Curated annotation (Swiss-Prot):
GO terms for molecular function: NADH dehydrogenase (ubiquinone) activity. Keywords: Electron transport, Membrane, Mitochondrion, NAD, Respiratory chain, Translocase, Transmembrane, Transmembrane helix, Transport, Ubiquinone. The lineage of its organism: Eukaryota, Metazoa, Echinodermata, Eleutherozoa, Echinozoa. This is NADH-ubiquinone oxidoreductase chain 3. GO terms for cellular component: mitochondrial membrane; NADH dehydrogenase complex. Its main location: mitochondrion.
């Protein structure tokens, strides 16, 4: 068991070192204006790509990622039913869903998420 772990750790470390050395040794490409410009479906960009975008859009994107992560954390719960007592699993699931619901209610009530002013 321990020799397998040491062997796999050695192999992954060697591969990581080889990739790091290859990235350092291989030449970098020349950066020209075309490579550094944003691509917009073959059209010339109308505005600068470095303009700030709406903070509300950023907030909605972050909230979407948080809810997506919370839903992804719910997926292993059916597999955990074989590992723990069913009552414990139900309590954990209910607590997790309560946190998810509380976050949804907070975001629903929170004024920064309203688009119309």
């Amino acid at each position: 068991m321990m020799t397998t772990t040491i062997f796999l750790f050695s192999i992954t470390s060697a591969v990581a070192i080889i990739f790091a050395l290859a990235a350092h040794i291989l030449p970098t490409r020349n950066n020209d204006g075309e490579k550094n410009s944003p691509y917009e479906c073959g059209f010339d960009p109308l505005n600068s790509a470095r303009l700030p975008f709406s903070f509300r859009f950023f907030l909605v994107a972050i909230l979407f990622l948080l809810f997506d992560l919370e839903i992804a954390l719910l997926f292993p719960l059916p597999a955990a039913s074989f590992l723990t007592h069913p009552t414990t699993l139900i309590l954990i699931s209910l607590a997790f869903m309560a946190i998810l619901d509380a976050g949804l209610v907070f975001e629903w009530i929170n004024p920064p998420l309203e688009w119309a002013e």
